[in-house]
From Swiss-Prot:
InterPro entries registered for this protein in UniProt: Peptidase_S8/S53_dom, Peptidase_S8/S53_dom_sf, Peptidase_S8_Asp-AS, Peptidase_S8_Ser-AS, Peptidase_S8_subtilisin-rel, Peptidases_S8_3, S8pro/Inhibitor_I9, S8pro/Inhibitor_I9_sf
Originating organism: Arabidopsis thaliana
Name under which the protein is recorded: Subtilisin-like protease SBT1.9
Glycosylated residues, chain numbering: N112, N162, N220, N381, N453, N617
Origin organism lineage: Eukaryota, Viridiplantae, Streptophyta, Embryophyta, Tracheophyta
Record keyword RNA-binding present: no
Gene3D superfamilies: 2.60.40.2310, 3.50.30.30, Peptidase S8 propeptide/proteinase inhibitor I9, Peptidase S8/S53 domain
Single GO cellular component term: extracellular region
Endpoints of the signal sequence: 1-20
Any one GO biological process: proteolysis
Subcellular location: Secreted
Amino acid sequence: MGMTVVIILVFSFFVAIVTAETSPYIIHMDLSAKPLPFSDHRSWFSTTLTSVITNRKPKIIYAYTDSVHGFSAVLTNSELQRLKHKPGYVSFTKDLPVKLHTTFSPKFIGLNSTSGTWPVSNYGAGIVIGIIDTGIWPDSPSFHDDGVGSVPSKWKGACEFNSSSLCNKKLIGAKVFNKGLFANNPDLRETKIGQYSSPYDTIGHGTHVAAIAAGNHVKNASYFSYAQGTASGIAPHAHLAIYKAAWEEGIYSSDVIAAIDQAIRDGVHVISLSLGLSFEDDDDNDGFGLENDPIAVASFAAIQKGVFVVTSGGNDGPYYWSLINGAPWIMTVGAGTIGRQFQGTLTFGNRVSFSFPSLFPGEFPSVQFPVTYIESGSVENKTLANRIVVCNENINIGSKLHQIRSTGAAAVVLITDKLLEEQDTIKFQFPVAFIGSKHRETIESYASSNKNNATAKLEFRKTVIGTKPAPEVGTYSSRGPFTSFPQILKPDILAPGTLILSAWPSVEQITGTRALPLFSGFNLLTGTSMAAPHVAGVAALIKQVHPNWSPSAIKSAIMTTALTLDNPLAVGAGHVSTNKVLNPGLIYDTTPQDFINFLCHEAKQSRKLINIITRSNISDACKKPSPYLNYPSIIAYFTSDQSSPKIFKRTLTNVGEAKRSYIVRVRGLKGLNVVVEPKKLMFSEKNEKLSYTVRLESPRGLQENVVYGLVSWVDEDEAEFEVSCSVVATSLVQES
């Protein structure tokens, strides 16, 4: 009997543990429901939380006031269920993990110091760019304040380094957000002093993206002599505010929201986020959609305050529906190449040479080495020391490379077409040359005819400018449509993202081995993470010249002046260009209320989102629902049996000369009947608004899954302006 009792008690204890399992949640509240006796929102949130937690001390992780209205807290499932019945409760989101999207680029997008956007915008002087990432390495010369103006008088931020002297006129704020990290990892402890309390960047990602957006000019920058030159951010005289919310152990929604909340309060003009959700854990939330995306929800509050928000679109390409961060009010950025390659040269003893991609950082003697050619099989029992080993493509690259290296070989040549997609992966610590299989016969012929006397020489650290095609979208760059809101064409724009040189923590090992670590103050990284801060910098330049322009106006100027390239589901409006962004002629402007009106038209899908971002109920928020959003691009969905036309309305605002006429020009859109009315827009004054409609019809069905083109407005007098709107017609259906 005693044994039975023990078993029951143990089982009961186990059940108690399971049912009492806690998780951090983000709770959205309706502030209009706050009872009068409470003096502030935090005290109301705290009392509400206390009323549902009975067996432990309740604790609010964050109370949000600017980006969203609500709080984050650790709750059991039963406590969460009780909270749902409390006055003011709107919805919850589990504190989901977030992931990072991991010299020449300013010139590549049209910036130069003698004329154009840089001098006109005073290099972004007076504009504050907020970077939400892994922190910053303040000692980097990219963050010196030479030539940077005074800190803006309205700035409210703080510098949380141990020494405030680490901040200056360039780096004007740095703050840490780690409460969500600790709530999700309660056993986490600091293993070194200041590990989780300092804005110092020990990962490198945040330093890299901050310097892309607004790093100062640094001469003689390079990655081990690759990409050598003067490094500069896109807005080198803008100020930087750093919000460290990303950690090696994880990134959490609650910390990201708190960082956006603080950035709005501090007074930033631009927010750059090179991170985002994957929604892999949507079963833990109240449904699937934008309402569960912390960046989407919090950034809406930012644009309401006039803050421009730019995000990376993700690195899960080249597949359709892989894009993230696609809320209509966010600028979503894809990544492309910049016409620059890093190479090595392989020269055989017969003087036949081959170029190959390489970022080998070490020194390598420029002399002829004896060559051993291996057709296949093991390298064991072969004398390879101080030789260049040439292997065929049927060799397993990873394991054989390790074996060959252990033999003391000087270098390896791999004859293969299986180059890894992201060029970042050519950062081998051992000298390796990838040569295409089309050259196999030439190499085999030389090696076989000179079996005992074949030699070769390898040379590294070569940078080649002007390679084609460029710009070209990276295969890794995520493609639209955006799963959570496919009604808007995404991404918005393409920017440089492949092997971008930028600042790096000089004490963090960048490559090499444990025995021979290598360090550098600059690094070459690839990803949409690198593309987003390019656009953040461009937005800062525009904001400096047009301080009263809305976030939508800035977005429009960037999109309508882009260099059109390819499928907009991959490149958006095209590649960012700064040649005309300060004077686009016409803009598509949109107010926060316009976004709400459009969401209201999609009320079935967006009801909870509307409630969260408007802090009111549907009937109050949705008095003027609209099927149209004045966006600088168009996407239309057609099914195989659908012939009814799709109609879109757009409104252009004249920001150019007072009197100017524009005529419409339609390009592409093969197989579609396209009617634009009117065909001419005649503006008589500055800031005048004129509207037009686009009618798309597919009488015989789409010839391809994706058909695209442009509707452009060209001024008829001087052809100085061409204001382009990308248009996509598609039969793509999202997989369930």
